[in-house]
């Protein structure tokens, strides 16, 4: 039993789903900055080692839990709408997190309460972390099933290209704005994805692809891992039976 997998160039992938490639690139920028500079941000905000550990734990667990409800919603409604809602939700919570970070604008009793920071950071992570799986499922809506693996590999490559610039760009934001430049950066790039999604909805109709559905995927998955997607069914091919004398 073998799986039939057809190749797909990056140009073909872009023509099939411009929004998928665009959002994959900039989500790579977001994710690399988020996971590399979160501890730097927390240290600059005078978090203790325990508090930094709590923040990184909340980031991971929120993203894992969010996969299930977000995936279910995306299989019912237009995935572009779900991506747009998630990105703008993450952008809004990123800005709110600035206000409860202890640096700005709120009364001391509220601003310095890390409980508020944790709460809004959880909501931010809940909106942001399922994004790659959503992007992959959205892209699959516009291609045939035999190209799912090739499309996933192309999106992973595009994600990696974006990831190379994330820490550098985010550090510029933090250098110009201060520690909270970290969340300003996250606000800007999430909003950029959401804005492009709105534009794409105006120029292209939604399609129904019964072969495409949300499957939770990590950002670091390889093309070989994408082949394990349970929706990619094997195709039976005849195996020649050769009798050989020994």
PLM feature spans:
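Intrinsic disorder in cytosolic terminal tails and internal cytosolic loops
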Residues: 2, 200-246
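Helix-loop boundary and gating motifs at the non-cytosolic
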Residues: 20, 31-48, 52
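Loop-to-transmembrane helix entry/capping segments in MFS-fold secondary transporters
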Residues: 49, 143-155
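Helix-to-loop junctions at the C-terminal end of transmembrane segments
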Residues: 66-78, 174-175
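Structural signature of the two symmetry-related core transmembrane helices
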Residues: 81-96, 187
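C-terminal ends and interior cores of transmembrane alpha-helices
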Residues: 89-109
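Intracellular juxtamembrane helix-capping segments at the cytosolic ends
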Residues: 129-143
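A membrane-interface helix-boundary motif in multi-pass transporters
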Residues: 172-190
């Amino acid at each position: 039993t073998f799986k039939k997998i057809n190749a797909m160039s990056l140009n073909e992938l872009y023509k099939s789903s411009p929004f998928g490639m665009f959002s994959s690139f900039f989500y790579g920028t977001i994710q690399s900055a988020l996971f590399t500079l979160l501890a730097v941000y927390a240290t600059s905000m005078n978090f203790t080692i325990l508090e930094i550990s709590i923040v990184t734990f909340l980031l991971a667990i929120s993203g894992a839990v969010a996969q299930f409800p977000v995936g279910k919603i995306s299989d019912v409604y237009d995935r572009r709408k779900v991506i747009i809602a998630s990105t703008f939700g993450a952008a809004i919570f990123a800005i709110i997190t600035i206000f409860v970070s202890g640096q700005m604008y709120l009364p001391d009793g509220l601003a310095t309460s890390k409980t508020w920071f944790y709460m809004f950071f959880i909501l931010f992570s809940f909106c942001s972390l399922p994004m790659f799986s959503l992007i992959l499922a959205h892209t699959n809506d516009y291609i045939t099933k035999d190209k799912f693996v090739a499309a996933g590999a192309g999106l992973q490559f595009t994600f990696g290209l974006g990831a190379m610039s994330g820490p550098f760009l985010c550090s510029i934001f933090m250098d110009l704005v201060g520690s909270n430049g970290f969340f300003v950066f996250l606000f800007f790039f999430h909003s950029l994805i959401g804005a492009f999604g709105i534009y794409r909805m105006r120029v292209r109709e939604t399609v129904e692809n019964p072969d495409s559905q949300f499957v939770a995927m990590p950002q670091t998955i390889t093309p070989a891992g994408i082949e394990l997607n349970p929706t990619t069914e094997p195709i039976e091919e005849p195996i020649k039976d050769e009798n050989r004398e020994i």
